[in-house]
């Protein structure tokens, strides 16, 4: 059955059973003959009378209308003859081309015969715009109107602009749009099938090529666009690194092999579009060197364009270049070595070459200015030499820069340790600026840990000598600098040379600078109270005078054990500092403090052991001094004690405290001391008490006498007070009345004066008010007169101007109308009245009374009944 609108069938379902069916124009119905079972088409306009053996299959349906530029597809179309008429079989049924399609374009409305179906509704024809195309494929073998034969499976393009008329043998695969190729662009194409491209070149399946012509490119039926390739814009600062994917000839006409790499620069072309046989490895930026830069290129490309593997080339600025494929920089761009007079370079030859920039130094290395001359020197691999400034140096590929040396400035009291790497000899350079040669290096001098600690501690050996137990701030030491030590005043330092095996003593104030093989003699002295060994570590020996304190324990003849705290004043006695023997004797006793304290303690113990406690308690200083210093030939106590080994002299002894060691002795001594203090205190207390009692008696007598004197004075004062009170009462009674009368009179006088003053003030106020009112009225009248005067003046000016304006208006009016016109206007009225009276035929008529005057001027107006215009 043919396709019909479902809604129409349901809406007119009742019409199929009617006997009379009215078919409008451009409508049709299918009528089924139930006897022959054959359906036919009835087309309107028609009033169809249905027979009993017929059945209308559907209500009237609108014919199919194909507007212009539209088409539809009919399935199972009817067969037509050469003239386009429908063919019927012997039974009267329309013949159908089953399973066939028919595309119908714009035509008159047509009905669908039984068996026909609309496979595709009315659809607009496809418009192919410019730069677009339809890729078509043949479904059946056919021959086009132009005579070209198509085989099933063939593909071709229908290019615009145009309207595509569909065929049943052709299927539209896709719409192809042209690719716009802009400036510096290309499109990469691939052949989907063997054929000829638009330029006429034969292409095989899978072959790729590029089209770079500016404009729109429409790919062929067997071409596909892989990518749009943008050109690389080449400048003076950018180049392109390209690799060949297969053998080909590049745009410059050179044959390239597979894997070959090269650079495309702006010298070749300004914009480069990589071809299908090229691969872009990367963009290479320009390498720019200024006048103070250089670089070393590894594996440089030779004149033949091939990398020279293992070789180097030095390039110095000013220059700009591109690194070619395979080349790379060693350590990047480097600065040219610009050496001043105080700088130098240690160089080493990596291969044999003839050096034309060598410098030969004079043999005297102490001179500050070293002369040099350019010669040709044959260098062998491994040779080391030094290049001194001032110079600007770029090392060649045969030279390696080992070190950059700079002159080390040294003061008179500064130095460095220098070691010759060839001989191993170490020496100290002191007091002048020095630059190491190519065979020298700085040597680090190692010191014992205790010496390092003493040197790195920022501590004054004289002022901070008692702070040996505190943690001092340590500063790191430069081991290549000459070790120096400032010897303070009245001190000595011993330095021992292990290579020469001799020592030297330096007295302060002076500066000690150690040689490479010299070391300080470290003093290890006893300290604290009582003395302990190895407490104080020191480099310098203080010569004094100074003191040391020690605590010793002694025992008397009666076995009383006492603890003494003694302070000794000491100093070293050196008569000649230049005498090496005397100077060396100072350091002959490593711990002179401990030895001296032990010797003195031994003497004191021996002397006290033969003395009773009471005698020692009373004569302790004499006993200790005699024990320490001894007696001379005259049996007098010596003034000092001298140790001949190192020249130490003990000049005095101070007993700071004496305490018993035994507790019972300490308690008994304390008790006796307390008893003596108590007796003395009681005696002083009794004396003070007697003196206080005497003073108290004297004070008490003075107090009684003072009391009697005060009572007499009080009675005398009371008498005077009573007399004054009586006199005051009399004066008070008399003065009260007098004062009251005086006050009343004074009040009346003041009141009268106030009334008079008030009256005067009121009169003055009224006078002032009256004068002010008169002044105000005068001002007001004056202003009012001025106002009236101005108004009158303005009114006069107004009337004058109005009269002038009116006269001007009348004058201009008269001038505008004219004298003749005015004469005519004046005569027009009377002449009209005369003519009207003449028309009435009146000769002369006068009717009046005696009391009414006659006005001949208005007679005509009265006769004619003219109305006087209201004013």
Swiss-Prot record:
Composition-biased stretches (Basic and acidic residues): 687-710
UniProt-listed Gene3D superfamilies: 2.30.30.560, 2.30.30.570, 2.30.30.620, 6.10.250.720, 6.20.380.10, Band 7 domain (3.30.479.30), Major Vault Protein repeat (2.30.30.550)
Pfam families with a match to the protein in the record: MVP_shoulder, Vault, Vault_2, Vault_3, Vault_4
Biased composition (Acidic residues): 357-370
Subcellular location: Cytoplasm; Nucleus
Keywords assigned by UniProt, alphabetized: Cytoplasm, Nucleus, Repeat, Ribonucleoprotein
Lineage: superkingdom: Eukaryota
Disulfide pattern: none
Domain called IQ: residue spans: 688-717
GO cellular component, one term: ribonucleoprotein complex
Stretches forming MVP repeats: 2-69, 70-124, 125-177, 178-230, 231-285, 286-336, 337-407, 408-482, 483-545
Disordered as annotated region, ranges: 356-381, 684-710
InterPro entries xrefs: Band_7/SPFH_dom_sf (IPR036013), MVP (IPR039059), MVP_rep_dom (IPR041139), MVP_rep_sf (IPR043023), MVP_shoulder (IPR021870), Vault_2 (IPR041134), Vault_2_sf (IPR043179), Vault_3 (IPR040989)
Coarse class of the protein's main subcellular location: cytoplasm
Physiological role: Required for normal vault structure. Vaults are multi-subunit structures that may act as scaffolds for proteins involved in signal transduction. Vaults may also play a role in nucleo-cytoplasmic transport.
Subunit: The vault ribonucleoprotein particle is a huge (400 A x 670 A) cage structure of 12.9 MDa. It consists of a dimer of half-vaults, with each half-vault comprising 39 identical major vault protein (MVP) chains, PARP4 and one or more vault RNAs (vRNAs).
Name of the molecule in the record: Major vault protein
